[in-house]
């Protein structure tokens, strides 16, 4: 009898896993197919110089081939992966374009898988407990949330309707998914893993023997952060800034009693610091008689693209703001959610107050860090909303949860339409 019960349990578990894996695999396959097509068109059209499917893919392809692109890309992960794939595709017509598109797609889709794993790890058990009659549903919910997050965008009105002070749909507002920038997309699997690993270490690193008990987590965090930096440093600058201020604040608050644990966690940043010094050496060297280095401003660069910053913020992170207002107590309970907002604030401050001097000023390169801040604000909000969905055991709670999902859906509908424009070759801004 016991063997029969155990056998039925195994069959149910296998069925649950089969349904969950099949649905998630189908979602990732569809997302991979459409994003690969976009990346491939960007590669082809950029090499042809048609002006359609605007991107920096031509420079990336030249960098991958070891040719002079006219730019400096001291972050090699995407280019090395594409070069490895090119060993196979070189004999094909358009093999270089195919290799770069495949590399970008693989890393972007890998980020979807990484996010799904993290959502399951941090909220999966709570969802399973709330849905005992449908054991396959929590996995489908986290999988759908993970994939859909890679298609959300800023909120924007229909064509022909203009909002006060908003000059562009994208520029000045910004999106968590800038489909025209391959290095941003490629860095996200490592950024996601580094973000969650740091969030997991925050509650424990000050404890006695934390290094000994969580040595593997320290090492993994250092590796993830270095890989993210070597793919695109924009996320790293934000995380390092937010983490540095947070760790210093904790150290001062404890009157340096946690000095040694803080140093041990700080050691994880050393490989990344060394790589950042290598990458940013060119920023501080004036070129062609122009001023170099990092300057301080008061939103001057941002103001070139937007005249209504409060509205732009609302359009970019309306969903995370709503989740925060309705679940503000989670800031005290959840270190990962709290750090998602600390990261967003740091990304905003950097974009508002800092800029690269000289010819790089108009590029507004600190906006890439801001977009990572937006992305992880969405990640944190999704974590909280999935948890709230599991706890929605009354009519009032279900209504509140539904309102938050509707806000997310609004960003998603705008994002899908924004992505559709990319597929048609439209400009990103």
What are these regions (language model features)?
Residues 137-202, 308-312, 364-374:
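Membrane-interface micro-motifs in multi-pass membrane enzymes
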Residues 102-132, 147, 193:
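Transmembrane-helix motifs of polytopic, lipid-linked glycan transferases
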Residues 59-102:
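Short hydrophobic/aromatic helix or loop-helix immediately within or flanking a transmembrane segment
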Residues 269-276, 281-429:
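Transmembrane helical bundles and short interhelical boundary loops of multi-pass, membrane-embedded
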Residues 239-269:
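Perimembrane helix-loop-helix junctions
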Residues 217-233, 239:
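Membrane-interface alpha helices of multi-pass inner-membrane proteins
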Residues 1-41, 126-144:
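Start-transfer (signal-anchor) and selected internal transmembrane alpha helices
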Residues 24-72, 87, 359-360, 425-429:
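Extracytoplasmic loop-helix module adjacent to an early transmembrane segment
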């Amino acid at each position: 009898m016991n063997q029969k019960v155990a056998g039925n349990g195994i069959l149910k578990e296998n069925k649950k896993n089969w349904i969950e894996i099949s649905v998630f695999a189908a979602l990732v396959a569809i997302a991979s197919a459409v994003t690969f097509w976009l990346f491939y068109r960007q590669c082809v059209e950029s090499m042809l110089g048609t002006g359609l499917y605007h991107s920096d893919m031509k420079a990336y392809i030249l960098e991958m081939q070891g040719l002079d692109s006219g730019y400096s890309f001291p972050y090699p992960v995407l280019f090395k992966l594409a070069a490895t794939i090119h060993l196979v595709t070189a004999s094909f017509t358009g093999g270089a374009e195919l290799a770069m598109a495949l590399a970008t797609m693989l890393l972007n889709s890998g980020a979807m898988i990484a996010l799904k794993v993290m959502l399951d790890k941090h909220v999966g058990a709570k969802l399973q407990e709330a849905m005992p009659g449908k054991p396959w549903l929590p996995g489908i919910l986290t999988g759908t949330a993970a994939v859909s997050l890679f298609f959300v965008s800023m909120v924007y009105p229909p064509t022909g309707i203009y909002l006060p002070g908003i000059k562009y749909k994208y520029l000045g507002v910004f999106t968590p998914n800038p489909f025209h920038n391959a290095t941003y997309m490629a860095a996200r699997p490592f950024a996601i893993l580094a973000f969650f690993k740091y969030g997991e270490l925050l509650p424990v690193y000050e404890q006695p023997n934390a290094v000994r008990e969580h040595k593997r987590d320290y090492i993994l965090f250092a590796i993830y952060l270095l890989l993210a930096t070597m793919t695109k440093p924009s996320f790293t600058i934000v995380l390092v800034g937010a983490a540095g201020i947070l760790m210093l604040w904790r150290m001062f608050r404890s009157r340096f009693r946690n000095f040694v644990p803080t140093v041990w966690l700080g050691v994880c940043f050393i490989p990344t610091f060394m790589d950042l010094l290598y990458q940013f050496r060119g920023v501080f060297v004036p070129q062609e008689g122009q001023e170099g280095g990092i300057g301080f401003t008061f939103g001057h660069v941002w103001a070139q693209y937007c005249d209504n910053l409060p509205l732009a913020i609302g359009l970019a992170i309306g969903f995370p703001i709503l989740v925060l207002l309705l679940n503000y107590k989670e800031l005290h309970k959840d270190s990962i959610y709290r750090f998602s907002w600390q990261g967003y604030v740091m990304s905003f401050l950097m974009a508002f107050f800092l800029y690269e001097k000289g010819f790089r000023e108009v590029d507004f390169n600190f906006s890439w860090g801001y977009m990572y801040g937006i992305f992880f604000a969405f990640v944190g909000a999704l974590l909280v909303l999935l948890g709230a969905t599991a706890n929605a055991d009354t009519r009032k709670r279900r209504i509140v949860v539904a309102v938050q999902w509707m806000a997310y859906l609004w960003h998603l509908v705008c994002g899908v339409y924004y992505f559709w424009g990319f597929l048609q070759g439209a400009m990103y801004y």
